[in-house]
Amino acid sequence: CIVANRGYYYIPHIVKKIEGQDSLDARFYERHYTMVEPKHFEPIVEGMWRGVNVGGTSTRARLDGWDVCGKTGTAENPRGRDHSTFLSFAPKDNPKIAISVYVENGGFGASAALPIASLLEEYYLTDTIRRPELLQYIKDMNIYYPAYDK
Protein backbone atom coordinates (compact mmCIF):
# COMPACT_ATOMS: atom_id res chain seq x y z
CA CYS A 1 0.00 0.00 0.00
CA ILE A 2 2.84 2.39 0.76
CA VAL A 3 4.19 2.10 -2.80
CA ALA A 4 0.71 2.44 -4.31
CA ASN A 5 0.04 5.55 -2.21
CA ARG A 6 3.51 6.98 -2.87
CA GLY A 7 4.61 7.04 0.74
CA TYR A 8 1.64 6.92 3.08
CA TYR A 9 -0.54 4.26 4.65
CA TYR A 10 -3.56 3.84 6.89
CA ILE A 11 -3.53 1.73 10.04
CA PRO A 12 -4.63 -1.79 9.01
CA HIS A 13 -7.79 -2.98 10.68
CA ILE A 14 -10.49 -5.61 10.44
CA VAL A 15 -14.13 -4.56 10.48
CA LYS A 16 -16.47 -7.13 12.02
CA LYS A 17 -19.58 -5.11 11.22
CA ILE A 18 -20.79 -1.55 10.79
CA GLU A 19 -23.98 -0.52 12.51
CA GLY A 20 -25.84 2.63 11.65
CA GLN A 21 -23.75 5.41 10.17
CA ASP A 22 -20.07 5.02 9.41
CA SER A 23 -18.72 4.19 12.83
CA LEU A 24 -15.05 3.48 12.13
CA ASP A 25 -12.61 5.00 14.54
CA ALA A 26 -11.22 8.29 13.17
CA ARG A 27 -7.64 7.04 13.47
CA PHE A 28 -8.33 4.60 10.61
CA TYR A 29 -8.81 7.56 8.26
CA GLU A 30 -5.57 9.26 9.25
CA ARG A 31 -2.68 9.11 6.79
CA HIS A 32 0.67 8.02 8.21
CA TYR A 33 3.69 9.05 6.16
CA THR A 34 7.02 7.31 5.71
CA MET A 35 10.26 9.27 5.68
CA VAL A 36 10.69 8.58 1.94
CA GLU A 37 9.75 11.43 -0.40
CA PRO A 38 6.88 10.60 -2.81
CA LYS A 39 9.07 11.27 -5.87
CA HIS A 40 11.16 8.20 -5.03
CA PHE A 41 8.15 5.91 -5.45
CA GLU A 42 7.46 6.97 -9.05
CA PRO A 43 10.16 4.79 -10.71
CA ILE A 44 8.94 1.78 -8.72
CA VAL A 45 5.31 2.41 -9.67
CA GLU A 46 6.31 2.90 -13.31
CA GLY A 47 8.28 -0.35 -13.29
CA MET A 48 5.35 -2.23 -11.76
CA TRP A 49 3.01 -0.74 -14.37
CA ARG A 50 5.37 -1.65 -17.23
CA GLY A 51 5.74 -5.21 -15.90
CA VAL A 52 2.01 -5.70 -16.36
CA ASN A 53 1.22 -3.52 -19.37
CA VAL A 54 4.35 -3.45 -21.54
CA GLY A 55 6.11 -6.75 -21.03
CA GLY A 56 7.46 -8.95 -18.29
CA THR A 57 6.37 -11.73 -15.99
CA SER A 58 3.22 -9.89 -14.87
CA THR A 59 1.42 -9.41 -18.21
CA ARG A 60 -1.25 -11.96 -17.27
CA ALA A 61 -2.47 -9.44 -14.66
CA ARG A 62 -3.70 -7.01 -17.34
CA LEU A 63 -7.30 -5.98 -16.86
CA ASP A 64 -9.14 -4.11 -19.62
CA GLY A 65 -10.03 -0.58 -18.57
CA TRP A 66 -7.71 -0.53 -15.54
CA ASP A 67 -4.08 0.50 -15.09
CA VAL A 68 -2.86 -2.46 -13.04
CA CYS A 69 0.61 -2.42 -11.47
CA GLY A 70 2.27 -5.59 -10.23
CA LYS A 71 5.42 -7.51 -9.38
CA THR A 72 5.90 -11.25 -9.35
CA GLY A 73 8.27 -12.99 -6.99
CA THR A 74 9.60 -16.45 -6.34
CA ALA A 75 10.79 -17.34 -2.84
CA GLU A 76 13.22 -20.24 -2.86
CA ASN A 77 12.28 -23.22 -0.73
CA PRO A 78 15.10 -25.61 0.18
CA ARG A 79 12.62 -28.36 1.09
CA GLY A 80 10.40 -28.46 -1.97
CA ARG A 81 8.74 -26.36 -4.62
CA ASP A 82 9.41 -22.63 -4.45
CA HIS A 83 6.80 -20.24 -3.07
CA SER A 84 4.84 -17.97 -5.41
CA THR A 85 4.31 -14.26 -4.62
CA PHE A 86 2.58 -11.37 -6.35
CA LEU A 87 2.13 -7.78 -5.19
CA SER A 88 -0.32 -5.60 -7.07
CA PHE A 89 -2.47 -2.49 -6.97
CA ALA A 90 -4.93 -0.74 -9.26
CA PRO A 91 -5.52 1.68 -10.70
CA LYS A 92 -2.03 3.13 -11.04
CA ASP A 93 -3.17 6.59 -10.00
CA ASN A 94 -5.57 6.90 -7.06
CA PRO A 95 -5.49 3.16 -6.19
CA LYS A 96 -8.66 1.48 -5.02
CA ILE A 97 -7.12 -1.91 -4.16
CA ALA A 98 -3.70 -3.19 -3.12
CA ILE A 99 -3.10 -6.90 -2.70
CA SER A 100 -0.34 -9.30 -1.80
CA VAL A 101 -0.68 -13.03 -2.45
CA TYR A 102 1.74 -15.67 -1.17
CA VAL A 103 1.21 -19.29 -2.19
CA GLU A 104 3.37 -21.84 -0.41
CA ASN A 105 4.87 -24.35 -2.84
CA GLY A 106 3.15 -22.49 -5.69
CA GLY A 107 6.22 -22.24 -7.91
CA PHE A 108 6.96 -19.06 -9.85
CA GLY A 109 5.12 -15.84 -8.95
CA ALA A 110 3.31 -15.78 -12.27
CA SER A 111 2.21 -19.41 -11.89
CA ALA A 112 0.02 -19.30 -8.77
CA ALA A 113 -0.02 -16.00 -6.88
CA LEU A 114 -0.54 -13.72 -9.90
CA PRO A 115 -3.71 -15.42 -11.19
CA ILE A 116 -5.26 -15.39 -7.71
CA ALA A 117 -4.45 -11.72 -7.11
CA SER A 118 -5.56 -10.71 -10.58
CA LEU A 119 -8.92 -12.43 -10.24
CA LEU A 120 -9.50 -10.83 -6.82
CA GLU A 121 -8.69 -7.40 -8.28
CA GLU A 122 -10.95 -8.03 -11.26
CA TYR A 123 -13.88 -8.97 -9.05
CA TYR A 124 -13.29 -6.06 -6.67
CA LEU A 125 -12.97 -3.45 -9.44
CA THR A 126 -15.63 -4.71 -11.86
CA ASP A 127 -18.00 -6.68 -9.60
CA THR A 128 -17.77 -9.58 -12.04
CA ILE A 129 -15.41 -12.24 -13.40
CA ARG A 130 -14.58 -11.41 -17.03
CA ARG A 131 -11.98 -14.17 -17.40
CA PRO A 132 -13.62 -17.49 -16.52
CA GLU A 133 -10.65 -19.33 -18.03
CA LEU A 134 -8.41 -17.79 -15.36
CA LEU A 135 -10.82 -18.91 -12.65
CA GLN A 136 -10.71 -22.43 -14.09
CA TYR A 137 -6.90 -22.30 -14.18
CA ILE A 138 -6.88 -21.49 -10.45
CA LYS A 139 -9.34 -24.29 -9.68
CA ASP A 140 -7.16 -26.75 -11.59
CA MET A 141 -3.88 -25.73 -9.92
CA ASN A 142 -2.13 -28.46 -8.01
CA ILE A 143 -0.34 -26.60 -5.24
CA TYR A 144 -0.56 -29.32 -2.64
CA TYR A 145 2.86 -30.38 -1.46
CA PRO A 146 3.09 -33.37 0.88
CA ALA A 147 4.69 -33.02 4.28
CA TYR A 148 8.43 -33.42 4.27
CA ASP A 149 10.84 -34.81 6.82
CA LYS A 150 12.57 -32.29 9.03
Q: Model features per residue range: what roles?
A:
Residues C1-H32, K39, M48-R130:
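Active-site beta-strand/loop architecture of penicillin-binding DD-peptidases
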